[in-house]
């Protein structure tokens, strides 16, 4: 009876699920999520990322950003994720946030990811952002600080001596801010061989800091983090340990996050992806170079560049349509990327509903 009541409260999700399967098949919908790495500049030297090595001379300027977001293309945007590089290195980050919120009347959540290096600067930027946002419309300003292990491990992964102390101090400072301002703070940890055996300790650290922690798997692509570093390669034993961690910890539940981890485990064992993805129809990814993509997996997925043509023409153009079709055939079935999965599961609905019912029935036979 309880399960039935829960499902009866889901007509909106049902309608969204039908719309998801209509969008991208019969029509090209307006984007509903923005992924915007606002700069390649970074003050970290992470072993699993090469963005800090990129040329920053072509970083998109504030007037071009203003021009891009003057389009009506963004009227359906619900989520915005601003990252980098290190986004707080941009002095105009607050103005970027203001421009985007003004362009997105249906915006519900804004996410900002930071490496936590430079506590004073980060706190200043967040206060500047809080000052310009309209929280009457915005449900959440979410800030994620990345911590990739305990002190020695984190500093080794980050490539910055003393990085752990800086980042944990940033967490403490932002936690204090969250007591007075409407921000939601979290810690993000990328699972990799160097920190595989510290995940329990990281959860303990998060509890002491009174901040939720989220794990994600190590990923590689041609835009963010191509690396031949042997420290990033899981041994056979480490891979088995990783699978055990997923089975016993990360996939043990009924949330959309648990669904993803269970699906990833299946993919690690040879199955094709079951998780829906928002990137093939709903995500507008704008890069510091001005390039627009649906996804960062392959170099051929570039739709166009806002320095050459308007955002709406790029989004609805023939090249974008061809790229999306090719992606669905060549990339999506074997893609294990996490980004956009929870958003897509909420919109697609039916995949998660099957998972939810199966788990609830098995838990309550």
Language model: regions and residue ranges:
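Flexible mid-to-C-terminal extensions adjoining Fe-S/redox cofactors in radical SAM and related proteins
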Residues: 17-18, 30, 52, 274, ...
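Activation segment
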Residues: 46, 91, 121, 154, ...
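Radical SAM enzyme [4Fe-4S]-AdoMet core and its adjacent flexible, acidic
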Residues: 2, 6, 13, 135-306, ...
């Amino acid at each position: 009876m309880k399960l039935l009541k829960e499902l009866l409260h889901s007509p909106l999700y049902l309608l969204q699920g039908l719309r998801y399967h209509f969008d991208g098949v019969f029509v090209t919908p307006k984007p509903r999520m923005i992924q915007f790495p606002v700069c390649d500049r970074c003050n970290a030297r992470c072993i699993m990322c090469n963005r800090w090595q990129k040329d920053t001379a072509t970083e998109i300027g504030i007037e071009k950003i203003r021009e891009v977001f003057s389009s009506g293309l963004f009227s359906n945007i619900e989520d915005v994720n601003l990252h980098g590089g290190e986004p707080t290195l941009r002095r105009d980050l607050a103005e970027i946030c203001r421009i985007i919120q003004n362009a997105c009347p249906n915006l519900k959540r804004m996410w900002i990811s930071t490496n936590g290096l430079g506590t004073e600067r980060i706190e200043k930027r967040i206060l500047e952002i809080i000052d310009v946002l309209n929280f009457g419309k915005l449900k959440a300003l979410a800030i994620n600080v990345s911590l990739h292990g305990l002190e020695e491990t984190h500093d080794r992964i980050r490539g910055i001596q003393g990085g752990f102390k800086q980042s944990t101090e940033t967490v403490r400072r932002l936690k204090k801010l969250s007591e007075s301002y409407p921000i939601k703070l979290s810690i993000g940890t990328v699972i990799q061989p160097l920190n595989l055996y510290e995940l329990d300790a990281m959860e303990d650290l998060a509890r002491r800091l009174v901040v939720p922690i989220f794990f994600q798997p190590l990923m590689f692509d041609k835009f963010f983090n191509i690396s031949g570093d042997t420290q990033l390669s899981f041994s056979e034993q480490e891979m088995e340990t990783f699978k055990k961690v997923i089975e016993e910890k990360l996939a043990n539940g009924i949330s959309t996050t648990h669904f993803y981890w269970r699906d990833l485990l299946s993919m690690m064992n040879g199955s094709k992806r079951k998780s829906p993805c928002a990137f093939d129809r709903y995500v507008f990814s704008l890069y510091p170079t001005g390039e627009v993509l649906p996804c960062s997996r392959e170099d051929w997925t570039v739709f166009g560049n806002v320095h050459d043509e308007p955002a709406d023409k790029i989004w609805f153009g023939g090249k974008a349509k061809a790229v999306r079709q090719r992606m669905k055939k060549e990339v999506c079935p074997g893609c294990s990327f996490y980004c956009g999965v929870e958003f897509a599961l909420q919109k697609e609905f039916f995949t998660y509903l099957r998972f939810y019912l199966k788990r609830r029935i098995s838990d309550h036979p």
